[in-house]
Amino acid sequence: MFEQEDEWISKTQMKKQMNDLQDLGMALTKLSNDTLKKIGLDADLYEAVTAYKKITSNGALKRQAQFIGRLMRDTDPAPIEAFLAKLRGDDAAHNAFLQRVEQARVRLLADDGALTQFMSDFPHADAGKLRTLIRNTKKEQEQNKPPKNFRALFQELKTVMENGDAEI
């Protein structure tokens, strides 16, 4: 008895899958080269995407887009989709992490004792740098200056919490 291993896919479904992959490839063309390097694309796909950015002729752009779609068929789209979702802010876990960082910043600015608690949770953090950023942020807010240190404090907390093991 003959058993078919693969599930039958209609021609319409195959075309839709190929168009979806090509659209995903086109999303890659909108990213900077530095961001593309972070994704860890296949060398051929990376070259095709960077070449697409340099092309000005409409016909050549269409051919290159189809070539990118062809290369995408040989590539696992899941990591690329996850990376793009993270860039767009669709990643729920990443959003939850950013909210925890924001809550930590609010606590540190509101309560002077919060820094001690934060340092016990993240002993590898630079207490002096955090203390300075907190002091400068409070001074900034009192003087209604642009939130330069407010943002710097967020970035520092984000870095510390990304590298730390404890949950805040």
Swiss-Prot record:
One of its GO terms (cellular component) is cytoplasm. One of its GO terms (biological process) is assembly of large subunit precursor of preribosome. Keywords: Cytoplasm, Ribosome biogenesis, RNA-binding, rRNA-binding. The keyword Secreted does not apply. It comes from the Bacteria. The keyword Iron does not apply. InterPro entries: DarP, DarP_sf. GO terms for molecular function: ribosome binding; rRNA binding. It is found in: Cytoplasm. Member of a network of 50S ribosomal subunit biogenesis factors which assembles along the 30S-50S interface, preventing incorrect 23S rRNA structures from forming. Promotes peptidyl transferase center (PTC) maturation. PANTHER family: UPF0307 PROTEIN YJGA. HAMAP family: DarP (MF_00765). NCBIfam families: PRK05255.1-1. Belongs to the DarP family. This is Dual-action ribosomal maturation protein DarP. The lineage of its organism: Bacteria, Pseudomonadati, Pseudomonadota, Betaproteobacteria, Neisseriales. The gene is darP.
